[in-house]
From Swiss-Prot:
Pfam families named among the record's database cross-references: GreA_GreB, GreA_GreB_N
Protein name from the UniProt record: Transcription elongation factor GreA
Family from the record: Belongs to the GreA/GreB family.
Coiled coil: none
Lineage: Bacteria, Pseudomonadati, Pseudomonadota, Alphaproteobacteria, Hyphomicrobiales
Keyword Lipoprotein: no
Record PROSITE patterns: GREAB_1, GREAB_2
GO molecular function: DNA binding; RNA polymerase binding
Amino acid sequence: MEKFPMTPRGFEKLKEELRWRQQSERPRIIEAIAEARAHGDLSENAEYHAAKEAQSLNEGRINELEDLVARAEVIDVSKLTGDRIKFGATVTMIDEDTEEEKIYQIVGDQEADVKEGRISISSPIARALIGKGEGDTIEVNAPGGSRSYEIIALKFV
């Protein structure tokens, strides 16, 4: 079973979704199926078929979440140190073309959210950052073309 890195925050969000799907969503769907069954003929009962589809999707996601929770390697980022970028690092960098400052934390694939400044460890930017330090410059090939960034700060929080 292959482990994958995850922050405590990301792990808690996974467990929270799993609990919600098991304890709230599953009973709601079961009740919707029972209610739709009470309407009679199941062959032409759209409510029944919709509820069964919702059940299938929910159970699939529960199985996926259980697998992710079992394989997660939770890494407490606040205990990490060093002057090189690795999983969990929060990196401040400057786009050398636009002078725009960007701040990203490198996190696991399941918890990445660019809008919140969390990028996946397997993303092109993170792969370019790993192993680098303050003052280094990276080149990232993105869909919009190649971009250069200077790393100006690195911390583990």
